[in-house]
Amino acid sequence: MRRGTRPTAKLLIVAVACAALVVGLVGLGFGLISRMNGSASDSVDEALTAIGDDPQAALEYLAPEEDGNVDEDGTWVPGQTTTDRWAMLTSRNWHKHTPGLDALTAAIGAASSFRNRAPSETDPDVSATADARATYACGRAMSYFGGEEFTKKSFTDIMKRNLAVVAANSSEDVSTAAINGALGAGATSAGLEATDISTLIYRFGDHQDAMTTLATGLGQYHHNKLKEAMNDPDANENDLRDEYHQVAASSSYLQTLSEFRFADDKKKDSEEQKTTVDTSLSVLNAVSSAGLTALTDEAAAPALAFTTGSTIAKPLI
């Protein structure tokens, strides 16, 4: 518990679960709404809002630690409670309660902060299953919000910012999609379809803050990979070139998807497009290469061109 007046994560989870139960009972015809002040939908929205800035509570709600296990491949296998919870969330008529989507995406964004984290001396309170559970939640979210249930008009500015956080914390998946975007299903280790990832990014591709957030996360991912390659005594020039090739692919991927969005909005070559694209690409390239010249004895990074525009399947609008 981070503040003395804040409810515990368990109490927050109970609140959300109870609200979800009410929604389920109403759907079965019990008519509980008539005996409540306000709607059951409002209760779900409020409960999700309560965990939106509490990463641990959000992760526990979206992928409860006691309801599943990590398989031999490191993948989270959810139990029935988790499966039912996601079924409720993804079948709810959110279009009648758009503010609820702001709260849901905030909770998912908070939970995504556990990706690529493991217990350590500097992070001792992290669960050993947190990364796998967060990866599961992010995968479900990117598939859902990048799927046919939504269009570009469904996304509020808040949703765009929140989902950009999810994508930024899932940079390994985004990078894989950037390289293998034409391959479709199974493009990432999480089994996500490349088109879902592309569509998700396309839908917030007109938002400068969202694209900058994604570029920052993606840049940090590539920075770490480049640093690993440079520090590996067994690595050769081709290994390093491959990593720079990945950076170029990611850069072109973001540019293409953002430009797709502006073109569809009849804003091609607008000042807004130029600012959004230029800012995000500058951030990605700056973060990915920050401080790395010292590791290569001041040698310049190779300039690699990579064009993905012809290989990215047109995203769902």
Predicted ranges, named:
Residues 1-15, 22-317:
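Non-catalytic all-alpha helical scaffold/repeat segments
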